[in-house]
A protein has these predicted regions:
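Non-heme di-metal
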Residues: 1-276
Length: 276
C-alpha cells in the first residue's frame, strides 16, 4: 500500500495507524480541517490496513487476562491495569475510525467527516484515562495489551459491516461496560476514575447514534436486529457485543428500539471470548 499525499486527512489517518512513536500515537497533531476541499485526497483509492503499528513499549499479547473481580479494585495496581485496558480500547477505536476513512473512500464525505470527529473524541477519552493512570503512578506501556478490536474490525469488507461491528457492536457494548465499571470504581473509593467512565458512557451514546444513523443510510432500511446480525463479520455473535445487564436507558437514547434490545438480551451465549 502506498501512503496518501502529505497534508491530507487520509495522510493524517495513515500516520496515526503507522507511527511507531508513542506520543504521536496517543496525542497526534491536529488533522486538516475536513470542511475544506484541499483536506481530502483527490481520487483516493481504498487502503485496507491489516494491523496497526505498535510502539516498542506497548507489548501485544494474544490472550487477555481475566477481568478482575470488583473487590480487587481496592488495589490501586488493579485499577491501573483496568484503566490501561480502557486506554488501549480508546486507542484502537481511534485507529479504526481512521482505518475506515482509508478503507472506504467511496462513502459520502459526511460519513468520513463524522469518522474523523469520532476518532478525535476517542483520543480525548484516551487522554482522560491516561491522566487517571498517571495519578496512580502508571503510564502507557506499563501493562501488556491486546489488539482484539483490530483482529475483528479490520476484516470488515463493507462500510455497513464496519458500522455494524465498530459502532453498533463494540461501542454499543461499551455503554454497558463503562457504566458497570464506573459503579465498581466508585464502590472501590476511586470516584475520579468513576467520573471519567461516566463521561465516556455519556459521550459514547452519540457515537452509537452516529452508527444507527449511518447503518440505516448505508443499508437503505431502518435498523433491524436480523439485518444487523447478518452484517457482522463471521464468526462474531451479538452475544460478545453486549454487557450484562443491558444499559437499556443509554441504548434507547442512542436509537435502538425495545424490540432490538429484547432480541439482544435473548441472544444465545457463544464460545468466543470477549476479553480485550
Amino acid at each position: 500500500l502506498s501512503p496518501p499525499p502529505n497534508g491530507t486527512l487520509e495522510a493524517w489517518c495513515w500516520d496515526l495507524i503507522h507511527t511507531p512513536h508513542l506520543e504521536h500515537k496517543l496525542c497526534p497533531p491536529a488533522p486538516p480541517d475536513p470542511r475544506t476541499e484541499e483536506a481530502w485526497e483527490l481520487a483516493a483509492v481504498p487502503r485496507r490496513i491489516p494491523r496497526a503499528m505498535r510502539p516498542p513499549c506497548l507489548q501485544s499479547i494474544e490472550r487477555s487476562p481475566k477481568t478482575p473481580k470488583p473487590a480487587a479494585l481496592r488495589n490501586p495496581k488493579t485499577r491501573a491495569l483496568l484503566l490501561h485496558t480502557f486506554l488501549h480500547h480508546e486507542l484502537q477505536a481511534a485507529e479504526l475510525f481512521a482505518w475506515a476513512v482509508l478503507a472506504f473512500p467511496e462513502t459520502p464525505r459526511a460519513f468520513r467527516t463524522g469518522l474523523i470527529r469520532l476518532c478525535l473524541e476517542e483520543l480525548q477519552h484516551l487522554a482522560l484515562y491516561r491522566a487517571r493512570l498517571a495519578s496512580l503512578g502508571h503510564h502507557a506501556g506499563d501493562f501488556p495489551v491486546r489488539d482484539w478490536f483490530w483482529e475483528r474490525v479490520a476484516t470488515c469488507e463493507t462500510p455497513a459491516a464496519f458500522v455494524a461491528l465498530q459502532g453498533l457492536g463494540l461501542e454499543g457494548a461499551n455503554l454497558e461496560h463503562s457504566a458497570r465499571f464506573a459503579a465498581q470504581f466508585r464502590a472501590a473509593g476511586d470516584s475520579d476514575s468513576a467520573a471519567v467512565l461516566e463521561q465516556v458512557e455519556r459521550e459514547e451514546i452519540g457515537h452509537v447514534a452516529f452508527a444507527v444513523q449511518w447503518f440505516e443510510r448505508l443499508t437503505g432500511a431502518p435498523l433491524d436486529y436480523r439485518r444487523w446480525r447478518e452484517a457482522l463479520p463471521k464468526p462474531l455473535s451479538p452475544a460478545v457485543l453486549q454487557g450484562k445487564p443491558i444499559n437499556r436507558k443509554a441504548r434507547l437514547r442512542a436509537g435502538f428500539d425495545e424490540q432490538f434490545l429484547q432480541c439482544l438480551e435473548a441472544e444465545p451465549s457463544t464460545a468466543i471470548r470477549r476479553e480485550a
